[in-house]
């Protein structure tokens, strides 16, 4: 198709959202659209939003208004809001944000070409398709760089955590077929991707809806036969991490010894209120087993402070757990009440300020742990995937112990270029970042 129109894509939120953005880019590319990062030159801007917590909603609205400000120098700019905010608040967006031309929910990503065509023609479409529709296979325009990419293996979630709106925005859990996943992985490997990051709301449930059993281990065995250097696992729920999966992670060199296991809390009362399966003791036992069975393992987790019912005793138990478990990477978030969730109706809610204070205290504990962990690398050699260069030309990258955007970096002297995998000797630590020299 001949098309002279130019589109800008702004992707907010989680890696799963970024994959949706990349799928939309590929559909637009096939339709002949060109892309730009310059909003002053774009005909249309798509803002793919998150609405998981209050801060994500605020970020999305601010980005919409910021994008609209470019109309002063680019009056023709059309704005499309897609993703979770659009799915959840389409009517409110239409009523309160006249800056928005098109609205496209999480069930309508495949309609992006027709939505862009409509807004460029002067229409104001609102599309919200079925959020639990079967997954469709579509190419992606990978935007993460020359050497790494996300691979989404499922969509939606069946876990029904009491604080979470994801099932109402993304639908029930739906696994992709193994054939579909492997075909995409082969294309990524052939394009030069060295690190494959496996994502879904809960990758440990992979296959249970399609094959009647969890199949993550089987899938990993097949993925590791392909030409990747690293395979990274994100969002494993604790209760489905079994011995077979642990053995595969421990024995397969391509699977990095870094696991992202969101636990949210350690106190049994709070876990029950969260509608999380398992107990604090089971979490402790799992982490102990993982460290025993997988030498050198680095753990990442997510925690929530201030859920209704969390008093000082429950919070202190969480702090004590952080000190004892010495989890190397963690994100701590103050509880955000979300309408339509069971937790939003619970009594005994602490104030927003108190939830924030507790999150900050947890992060102070975590900062000490992370600083101590960084010091252990001094004098060691690490494989580093080169991501870019500092303004002065110094290369930087990530080790297997660092996931993109959320963890640390390795900055080193040498002549490596983005996309390279090099060996670096670590000489020092600067504000949590490792400093070294290419060998």
Annotate each language-model stretch with its function.
Residues 1-206, 244, 259, 281-292, ...:
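Proteins enriched for Cys/Gly/acidic motifs involved in redox and nucleic-acid/cofactor modification
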Residues 79-80, 88, 93, 190-313, ...:
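Conserved SAM/AdoMet-binding glycine-rich loop
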Residues 10, 199-201, 234-236, 262-264, ...:
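Generic beta-strand/beta-sheet core signal
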Residues 161, 181, 198, 233, ...:
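Conserved, mostly hydrophobic/aromatic
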Residues 345-439:
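Terminal RNA-binding accessory module
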Residues 25-27, 120, 248-251, 275-278, ...:
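Short, solvent-exposed amphipathic alpha-helical segments in soluble enzyme
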Residues 5, 33, 77, 101, ...:
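A structural micro-motif
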């Amino acid at each position: 198709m001949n098309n002279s129109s130019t589109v800008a894509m702004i992707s907010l939120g989680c890696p799963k959202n970024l994959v949706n953005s990349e799928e939309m880019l590929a559909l637009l590319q096939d339709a002949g659209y060109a892309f730009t990062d310059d909003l002053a030159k774009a005909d249309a801007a798509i803002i793919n939003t998150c609405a998981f917590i209050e801060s994500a909603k605020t970020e999305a609205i601010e980005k919409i208004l910021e994008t609209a400000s470019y109309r002063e120098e680019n009056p023709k700019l059309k704005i499309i809001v897609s993703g979770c905010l659009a799915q959840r608040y389409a009517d409110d967006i239409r009523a309160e944000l006249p800056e928005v031309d098109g609205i496209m929910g999480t069930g309508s990503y495949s309609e992006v070409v027709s939505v862009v065509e409509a807004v460029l023609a002067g229409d104001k479409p609102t599309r919200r398709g079925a959020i639990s529709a079967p997954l469709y296979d579509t190419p992606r325009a990978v935007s993460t760089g020359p050497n790494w990419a996300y691979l989404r293996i499922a969509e939606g979630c069946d876990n029904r955590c009491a604080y979470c709106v994801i099932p109402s925005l993304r639908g029930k859990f739906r696994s992709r077929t193994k054939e579909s996943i492997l075909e995409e992985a082969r294309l990524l490997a052939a394009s030069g991707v060295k690190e494959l990051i496996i994502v879904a709301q809960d990758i440990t449930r992979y296959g249970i809806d399609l094959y009647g059993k969890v199949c993550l281990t089987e899938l990993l065995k097949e993925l590791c036969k392909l030409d990747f250097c690293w395979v990274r696992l994100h969002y494993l729920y604790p209760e489905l991490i079994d011995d077979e999966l642990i053995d595969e992670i421990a024995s397969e060199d391509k699977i990095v010894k870094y696991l992202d296991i969101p636990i949210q809390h350690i106190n049994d009362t709070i876990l029950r209120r969260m509608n999380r399966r398992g107990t604090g003791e089971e979490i402790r036992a799992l982490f102990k087993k993982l460290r025993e069975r997988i030498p050198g393992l680095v753990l990442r987790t997510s925690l929530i402070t201030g859920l209704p019912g969390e008093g000082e005793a429950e919070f202190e138990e969480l702090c004590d757990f952080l000190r004892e478990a010495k989890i190397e990477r963690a994100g701590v978030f103050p509880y955000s009440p979300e309408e339509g969730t069971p937790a939003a109706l619970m009594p005994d809610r602490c104030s927003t300020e108190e939830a924030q204070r507790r999150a900050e205290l947890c992060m102070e504990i975590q900062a000490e742990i992370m600083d101590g962990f960084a010091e252990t690398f001094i004098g060691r050699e690490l494989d580093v995937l080169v991501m870019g260069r500092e303004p002065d030309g110094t290369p930087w990258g990530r080790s297997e112990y660092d996931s993109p955007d959320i963890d640390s970096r390795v900055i080193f002297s040498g002549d490596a270029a983005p996309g390279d995998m090099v060996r670096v000797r670590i000489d020092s630590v600067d504000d949590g970042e490792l400093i070294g020299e290419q060998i």
